[in-house]
Structure formats: C-alpha cells, structure tokens
Amino acid sequence: AALAGSPLFRGRFQKAVAISGGLSLADPHAAAQKLAENFAPLAVEDGRFADTASAAEWLLTPGADVREWLCGLEPARIAALGKPAILYADGVVPSRDARSAASLLLLSSATEFSGFVRDDLRPASSAARAYAVKYGSALCRWSSTEAVAEALGGSAPVWLGLIDYGGTDSQTAIPGLGSFHGLPLALFSSESSYSACADLSSAGAQALSARLKQALAGFMTSGSPGWDAWTPQDRAALHFDADSETACITLSSYPDTQESIRAAMAADTSLSAAEKE
C-alpha cells in the first residue's frame, strides 16, 4: 500500500494487493529519532563519528551529505538491522495530487497480533497478553485496511477484505493463534511457510481458500474482487469465514474506528492503568 501510494511509483502500478500492510501511525519526530538511533552505528563503523550519539544527531540534519550516505549504504548492512521497513513509519501521507492512483485490494486477519504477542515476553500475565492480542489486533487490522482507504481519500478504488476464519468470532477456532498474521497467504497457497501454523485441510477451509483465490483473480483480471468498493458512507468490507464444511462470506460496514478501539481499551477493566502502560 505504501509503494502504491508513493509518488516515486506513479504510473508503475495499475493495481496492487496488500496483505496486513498499510500506512504508518507513528509520530514523525519519534520515528525520526528511532531511525537515527538504528542507523547511527553504521555511521560510526564508516568512521564518520566516534560515538553513536554524535552520529544520530548528524542523521537528523537535512544536509545533502546525510542523504548521500544513506543512499550509498549496501542493502546487506541495512538488512542486518532487522526488518528495517518497519522503522520507516512517519505518519506522513503524500498529498492526493502526488500519489500514484492504483486500485487496491487490502486484506487483514482478525487476530494479527497473536503471533507477535506469543513471541514477546513483556506481557507477563495472561490478562495482559489477552489485552495485547485483542486491541493490538484491532488497531493493526484497522491500520492495514480502513485507515489506508481513509488516507487515500478516493484517489483510487479500494476494497477491504477481513479474514475472520480462526478468530474469536469465527465459526472455526484455530487454537492458540486465532486468525493469525499470515493466514491469508496460507489460504492462498499450501506452499506458504504460514501453512504449518494451522490445519487448513477441512472442506470449509478449502472452500474459503477457493473464494479468496476467486476474489484475487477477479481483482487482477477485471479490476474488481467481486464486492462493493469502500466509501466513507458505507465503509464496505467483506468478511471471510468458514465452518467445517462451507465458506461463510458476508458484506457489512467496517466494524471499528480508531476512536472506538481506543475507547474500548480505556474502558477495559481487565488491567489497571499502570498495567496497560
């Protein structure tokens, strides 16, 4: 979604599919500080500065020398930082006139955060982990779908697809992970590494897989996945679920807003205010 919306890629996309990947939510100042901290050791390695604090301060300046150095870094050195693309969240969306006008199909799972919380030791209690999964997933899902549609402001058609299968409200439970990050890829292809995370051999899961593939094929060949595009008025989103035998597909308005999710987080009494922080 970020590439398709970038002015640098204007004219290069006719359409694009983004799975669990939208625009950014981070504060620009905080994101810049984070970037500088992560790249500072590389500047020290190159002998530009004796310490990382001085290097980070330099990286925050707008000089051409900073840009030249960053653009000249070997990709392998950047990759060694660990998923650097995630660090580039700055919350800034290009103006509508600057964006690439590409149709988008945006897909996201119901419990995107389940795997991330499982691998994170910081939420010590089961209540804290449940809180992180519930609201982290809701915010991740929103930022990967409707937030993108809102930010693009009608510059191109956008379709939203929500994978409910395996999640809390699904007719089929996936123990431990729910509707996990990467589930759409597993439903698209059994060769995906995410296929090992759940048994998708039931007739219902296979029917759901077929419906997802049909939507993808329709979008790529005809320009529409087969349901209504998102608008600010109806906020259309197609929900993909399945029982043990059949796929269960429903069209409804997007279930949350950023404000409603944050309000629910504040009202949740399962954790104290200190624990939430």
Model-found features: residue ranges?
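NAD(P)H-dependent oxidoreductase Rossmann-fold/reductase module
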Residues: A1, A30-N38, L177-S179
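Primarily recognizes the serine-hydrolase "nucleophile elbow" in alpha/beta-hydrolase
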Residues: A1-A30
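Sec-exported extracytoplasmic/periplasmic mature domains
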Residues: G5-L8, V44, P75, G153, ...
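Extracytoplasmic/cell-surface-exposed regions of Actinobacterial cell-envelope-associated
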Residues: S6, R10, A31-Q33, L60, ...
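Substrate-gating cap/lid region and adjacent catalytic-acid/histidine neighborhood
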Residues: K15, S24, T61-Q206, S222
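Helix-rich cap/lid subdomain of alpha/beta-hydrolase
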Residues: A31-R67
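Alpha/beta-hydrolase-fold serine-hydrolase catalytic core, especially in secreted/extracellular enzymes
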Residues: G153-V158, G166-G167, S192-E277
